[in-house]
Every structure is written in structure tokens, then in C-alpha cells.
Amino acid sequence: TKGFAESEKFIALCEYIGNEFPSVVGIRDDAAGEKYTPPHILTTAIKRLNKVAAKEFDINKLNIQDKKCIEKLITYLCAPRFLQVINSYVTKQSRELFESEYIRSTWDKPDLTSDELNLYVNVCMDYVNLKEIEQHKQKLNLMFDDAEGQNELTMRLTEMLKTKAEEYNQCINRIDKMLAKLNGERAKRVANQQQRNASII
């Protein structure tokens, strides 16, 4: 059986809300058709990294490890799946959040595999999902306040809020599980590499 979020009533209610409250649910497609431009040189990558990760890197004062990390970050930001996903977002807010979380998550990990990068893309997609779900909940709460006395509408809005709360919790759980998997696997790999290096020495 279909859940409420897939039901005809839910779809009809969404259409009703879109017609009755256009200013509340409207989202401007302010990035539609614009292609994301990844950084290709160190200075541009450093500027973005400093902005989103609260760093103060200076290209003239980079140590070898930091330079290696930032050079690798440039390749991460040119990865095909990252580009595909970021270009699928039609609002600048979603693109900026996705890019920021991706940079924060990956910039200091120059040894990530392709599979791990794809998982970080998934994590960052869920960060965007969380933001969108939270915005939907806020809008539904506003409409709930405006619909006082309209029993049928308030009942449906209550069901929609419950659905959004469940989506939010599922999203949080997915992020936690993926990060635990990523951090655990990388920690093992780094430990094994250190062990191999020690045995060579």
C-alpha cells in the first residue's frame, strides 16, 4: 500500500498549497542552466577552502602536506559525479551548501578512493536534503498557523508535518551511518599504511 506521501490526497494537497500559498512554497530557480565552475589553480581552491572551512591558508606559506591536500581537493572538485550532482541543483543556496559540505568533508583526506568520494557525495546530498526538509517543515508550520479553524486542512498539514519529521530522522540516520563507514574504513587504511611504512624503515 502507498504511504501518505505517495497518496493522491497528498499530491492534491500539495497542488492546493502551491495554488493558495505561492509565496510560501515558491523557490526561485536562480541557478538553473548555470554550470558549476570548479577551481583549477591553487589560489582559487585556497580561497574557497578558507571561506567554507574557516582556514587562513596563504599560498606562499603552505607546507608540503597542506599543498598536497589542496591539490587533491582540486581533483575532487572535478570528479564526474560531484559535477553531475552539483549541476542538478537549481538554487544557489543548495549548490553552495553541497559544495561547502563536500570541501569540509574531503579537503584534508588526500587518499580517498573513488568509492569513498561517491559516498561523500551521498552524504553531502543528504545535508542538502536536511536543509530542504527543514525549510518545508517551517513553511508547513506557517500554513498550519494560518489554517486555524479549517479542520480538514489542519489535519492534512499535520500528516504532512509527520511525514517530514520521519524523512528528517531517516536522513540524519543515513548521514551517521555513512560517516561511520567512511571514517572507519579510512582509519584502517591509514593505520595499515603507517604499519607498512614502519616495516620498511
PLM feature spans:
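Intrinsically disordered, low-complexity, charged/polar segments
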Residues: 1-201
